[in-house]
């Protein structure tokens, strides 16, 4: 996908290879030099809860019309996204943002592109997506009743806790499963632990640029390469959001339900402003993580860039309209080195097989 300079200038921000130098971050009082970090050891979860959450994640009965599951937009075979620029959302609707990977959710400070949900509460993320009309459109009470009529789920539930299936705990189980999904065996992690042969010389040069000349590390740091903050880098609008009435309707409804003033006059994705109502947040989106980029194209909050080369070229020009970034002045070879480095942050594909939907069996409540 090609974009003229005005659009191209907007996109590297949501994906976030920012041009602010690391020294600027230090000057802002952040102390020691920022850097990426290897993935930490996985936290021990509740095995019974994770198993239930996996079942629910793949079960279409958690959507209003049985048409979609969590895995419909977060497919293990597609990097736990959907491979589309803009998500389809609930059947008969079209969504206005990209479906991000759920990998490494345990390390997110905030969830969703506008950062509206606390990263410490994955159960609320599951509830938000399952009950939202434009994603899965499920009533929590109906969901609870459906799942109670699946004997296999009732048995699994008893392994976890000695009570009946409960709506909020269903969401918590899905959240527990999501937070068990993590990047593993990325070449960069071995390199960061001392194996100098784990990544190529070109990728090592890209890492030096990432921390130095390009200044990407100012916003992309920590184990998943995200500071979890909101930034405006002028990512271009995806034309289909306004050209496709179904996507426009979804966007405007999101604004309306968020209480955004004058929402009917909006003709762009205002980002975090719809949540905060602070005009300084117009066009701001959460810094994307950099893990598993090999599997999660297209990129940015609206999927406007098909390749990492486009992303790097966009940021090299200083971002888009309204961006505070400066051009990176990277040569073609330096841009290629940066892309080579970014790919080292991807681990082995994490494939989880769909366990299938267990049969339902109407519950017997006793004699009439």
UniProtKB/Swiss-Prot annotation:
Q: What Gene Ontology terms describe where this protein resides (cellular component)?
A: periplasmic space
Which Pfam family is one of this chain's hits?
CCP_MauG
Domain (Cytochrome c): residue spans on this chain: 48-158, 201-346
The cross-references to PROSITE patterns, in alphabetical order and at most eight, read: CYTC
Coiled coil, from the record: none
Gene Ontology molecular function, alphabetical: cytochrome-c peroxidase activity; electron transfer activity; heme binding; metal ion binding
> What's this chain's function?
Involved in iodate respiration. Probably reduces the H(2)O(2) produced by IdrA/IdrB to H(2)O, using a reduced cytochrome c as the electron donor.
* Protein name, UniProt field: Cytochrome-c peroxidase IdrP2
List the source organism.
Pseudomonas sp. (strain SCT)
Taxonomic lineage is: Bacteria, Pseudomonadati, Pseudomonadota, Gammaproteobacteria, Pseudomonadales
Instruction: Quote the gene name from the UniProt entry.
Output: idrP2
